[in-house]
Amino acid sequence: MKIRILSLMLLSLIGATSVKNGDDAPLFNLLNQDDQTVSLEEFKGKKVVLEWTNHDCPFVKRHYDTGNMQNLQKEMSDQDIVWLSIVSSAKGKQGYITNDQAKELTKKRSAYPSHVLLDAEGSVGRMFSAKTTPHMFVIDELGKVRYQGAIDNLGNTGALFSTDLSK
């Protein structure tokens, strides 16, 4: 009985820490592909897309192989929207990449992220409860989370981003 109660308490705490639409986005600092510290706070006043990615994920591969992700990244860049690709895979685990591999993947895929951020400890992934890839978050100029979920939840990714980012 004690284990059941403790389990329920733990689950309620886990649920309480997840980010909800309308919440302030948790602030973080991560190293990018060039080993420079990037802070979410430095983009206050700009719209930001967070893309949790794993180059070995079949869903990520599909979006990059078809050019869908690159087209969205380019479109967002043209609108001065910051795109942060985040890799939360631990060293020795599937999906882990080094700084050099991040640069190589970006070039090979002709991708347009503003930065590739390496979160090998998974701390930022846990802050946002990002568990799948590609898991997307849209943050407005005030630092509020306006969307979270799959890139293709609405079927038309362009509409998804133009709708959510125009708020």
Locations of regions flagged by a protein language model:
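Cleaved targeting-peptide boundary
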Residues: 17-25
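Thiol-/selenol-based redox modules, centered on thioredoxin-like
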Residues: 140-167
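Loop/turn elements at helix/coil->beta-strand transitions in domains of secreted/extracellular proteins
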Residues: 45-48, 78-83, 111-114, 141
